[in-house]
């Protein structure tokens, strides 16, 4: 089974990031901010304006407090748990919210993959991984050139601006390996790839026969330029995937259009994303499985993440979360998040796997304590 994904970087960043194969893919081993303590404080407290980051009008951030977010309209979640969760908010300043929107699948799928170079990555026994590599040109994205912002600030994360969606973080591969080892079943399930970035987790669910897959990332550019091309590149006919007569870098594959209807794409902050999907005219069916990797690095986001699980996870569903034990420089980590969850008494957590290579990492399952 071929597994392809698009990873977009700028030429001048290729030496700055860690290449896996000829600079085609970057895998960061720590998700630690390479900024000073004073810079970290400034990033947490700074208010981002459209003028400061040269954002166009259609990418304006919504600056409003968490208290103004609309309450959940769903009735499936335990009411007592929801009430408890709302009454236990974290201390400290809440990040500004970015409006959520849905991204339509382009009609011209062939054009989306034009001038893309497909390369196969080594190291996976049961899944063949390939890269669709493109170059991000500044002139094409003058308003939201988040890669340049990240580079100029010497940081992989810019709070409220860029949340790391252009990198493939290490724990993503841990979770992919767990899927294979634990024989995780996706067939017939509705799946959310939360904080999707390149979309590898959701693409795995897509290939595994999920009935519906939603991809969400904070940045709209990540969805348009990374996630969408990856999904299209991976929705190919099996006979073309197995064609070895042409080298990977030359092969042009026809999109499996009949399967793409199962995929939907969203950008924006988590609470705004919840409001968007729950406010649709059609009755929203909650997710059987939420997949997320390296999303608990910042304690300021824990309340929104917890509320997202509460509002969108089906009563018998589960979350599979991959994370490092601790994120130096931003303060989050597994034990702090587990404590946060335990205090709210809504979900229970279970450690499925511990990876001791390099920085200690975990695969965690999250389910409702009282699903009834």
Curated annotation (Swiss-Prot):
The keyword Nucleus applies. Residues 39-49 have a biased composition (Basic and acidic residues). GO terms for molecular function: heat shock protein binding; protein-L-histidine N-tele-methyltransferase activity. Keywords: Cytoplasm, Methylation, Methyltransferase, Nucleus, Phosphoprotein, S-adenosyl-L-methionine, Transferase. S-adenosyl-L-methionine binds at residues 168-172, 195, 216-218, 268-270, 293. Gene3D superfamilies: Vaccinia Virus protein VP39. Monomethylated at His-154 through automethylation. Automethylation at His-154 positively regulates the methyltransferase activity toward RPL3. Probably methylated on other residues. Its EC number is 2.1.1.85. Transmembrane segments: none annotated. It is an enzyme of class 2 (transferase). Residues 70-87 have a biased composition (Polar residues). Belongs to the methyltransferase superfamily. METTL18 family. Protein-L-histidine N-tele-methyltransferase that specifically monomethylates RPL3, thereby regulating translation elongation. Histidine methylation of RPL3 regulates translation elongation by slowing ribosome traversal on tyrosine codons: slower elongation provides enough time for proper folding of synthesized proteins and prevents cellular aggregation of tyrosine-rich proteins. This is Histidine protein methyltransferase 1 homolog. It comes from Homo sapiens (Human).
